Amino acid sequence: MLSKRIVTALNTAVKVQNAGIATTARGMAGASGSEVSKILEERILGTETGINLEETGKVLSIGDGIARVYGLKNIQAEEMVEFDSGIKGMAMNLDVDNVGVVVFGNDKVIREGDIVKRTGAIVDVPVGDGLLGRVVDALGNPIDGKGPIANARRSRVEVKAPGIIPRLSVREPMVTGVKAVDSLVPIGRGQRELIIGDRQTGKTAIAIDTIINQKRFNDAGDDKKKLFCIYVAVGQKRSTVAQIVKRLTDAGAMDYTIVVSATASDAAPLQFLAPYSGCAMGEHFRDNGKHALIIFDDLSKQAVAYRQMSLLLRRPPGREAYPGDVFYLHSRLLERAAKMNNSLGGGSLTALPVIETQAGDVSAYIPTNVISITDGQIFLETELFYKGVRPAINVGLSVSRVGSAAQTKAMKQVAGSMKLELAQYREVAAFAQFGSDLDASTQQLLNRGVRLTELLKQGQYVPMGIEEQVGVIYAGVKGYLDKVDPSAITKFEKEFLAHLRSSQQALLKTIREEGQISPQTDAQLKDVVVNFLATFKP
């Protein structure tokens, strides 16, 4: 009799369990694999955890920096999530049955079954004056060992670029201190100028010189001329970034500079995010009526990181295996550089993106994309670099589409004819090597071209003021150096600049403040050059 009762009780228990399993199976139809078996096991054991699937989820799989998460039903696109281990991630793929999350850090500490929580916030970073002089990672966390960042508020990394009405056309010069750039491909505040070339051709050198050159304006105390700088290092070696920070510190340029670093050893999502984080920091200055310069070094590596993420998220590949929206990746970033109108404070954000080409091929996918987005490009050539022409700027292929409107009148007056003369020189030089008997005008063109090319050479980390550039270029363009041996041009420039700085400060001040060469200044400059050449010994 007792055994009969036990059997009846067991049968009842099995029926209850079966009913529970059927309910669970219907409720969890969206889950798969180990997740389903885990939930069923918990239900059978009567230890249901009661997780809220709207606000939390569980890791189904983890690998290659991508986590597939079950749950998180209410999550937004690009929302930050937090894993059990404290590592942050960003929701990129919102699929029917799971969420694809890119992990901002080491995915080795994340396990299957870990809880993932929504933060309710889109990815944001600290912005403000407190970041000046600091080195931060792609999420704005300090990595320079100088303690937490003070005096900063938080801002989203992805914001919409300013529309047409809030903008003004580019009108103020952004002086780089590099003669070849300021005279031939001038850049204005609010412009996007691409620096493009093969590896080891001096792309970063131009960018760093530009940052160092802003010291003269920032030290002058005029808020309208101050330019704050953001240097974004993407996919570079840590040793290279440390070297750049040391160089900027030695030059006293870190006082007005922020360095955002996502090095080669950082996760691909951080390399993808770093340019947007840097841009948000630059927009703080732009939107508060100040001026900022941002350097993306380089966007080729950001595109590679984005390709890696997209392929791992199973997004369909396109040309060169890049995803279909790789153009939008860069356009939405670079469109945020702008010159704002006066009612919005008149601030500006200037962008100098860097692109690395392979064997000088500017017709590849990413280079052509960025060329079409920017307002001009500075093209650096390996061949010129090895010939000793440094900066190795190909004047024929380099162009600034809007910068001439911002160029100072003094520079326009002296450098106006130089681009044409150099273009004619290159054309004639190609034919001159085939024949020796040249007419006088062709010989004159060759002589002038050789000397102007020598004159545009410049050492690294020695940017020049615009008034000094005007003085040197004036001597070359007006023909005063035609009789000076090309090998002595560098010596002439060095001694002539020393002469101007020591005994012609009033003349330099006039050029700097008036911004143009009046007939009186022209006569004065002529006298200075002629008198100096009379005593110059090559």
UniProtKB/Swiss-Prot annotation:
It comes from the Eukaryota. Disruption phenotype: RNAi-mediated knockdown of the protein leads to impaired growth and development. In addition, it impairs the assimilation of enterobactin-bound iron. The record marks 398 as: Required for activity. PROSITE patterns: ATPASE_ALPHA_BETA (PS00152). Transmembrane segments: none annotated. ATP binds at residues 197-204. Residues 228-248 are annotated as: Essential and sufficient for enterobactin binding. SUPFAM superfamilies: C-terminal domain of alpha and beta subunits of F1 ATP synthase, N-terminal domain of alpha and beta subunits of F1 ATP synthase, P-loop containing nucleoside triphosphate hydrolases. Signal peptide: none annotated. Ubiquitous (at protein level). It is found in: Mitochondrion; Mitochondrion inner membrane. It is a peripheral membrane protein. The keyword Oxidoreductase does not apply. The siderophore enterobactin (Ent) produced by enteric bacteria binds Fe(3+) and helps them scavenge iron ions from the environment. Enterobactin produced by non-pathogenic E.coli strains facilitates iron assimilation in C.elegans. Other siderophores, such as ferrichrome and pyoverdine that is produced by pathogenic bacteria, do not facilitate intestinal iron absorption in C.elegans. Subunit of the F-type ATPase which has 2 components, CF(1) - the catalytic core - and CF(0) - the membrane proton channel. Belongs to the ATPase alpha/beta chains family. Mitochondrial membrane ATP synthase (F(1)F(0) ATP synthase or Complex V) produces ATP from ADP in the presence of a proton gradient across the membrane which is generated by electron transport complexes of the respiratory chain. F-type ATPases consist of two structural domains, F(1) - containing the extramembraneous catalytic core, and F(0) - containing the membrane proton channel, linked together by a central stalk and a peripheral stalk. During catalysis, ATP synthesis in the catalytic domain of F(1) is coupled via a rotary mechanism of the central stalk subunits to proton translocation. This is ATP synthase subunit alpha, mitochondrial. The lineage of its organism: Eukaryota, Metazoa, Ecdysozoa, Nematoda, Chromadorea.
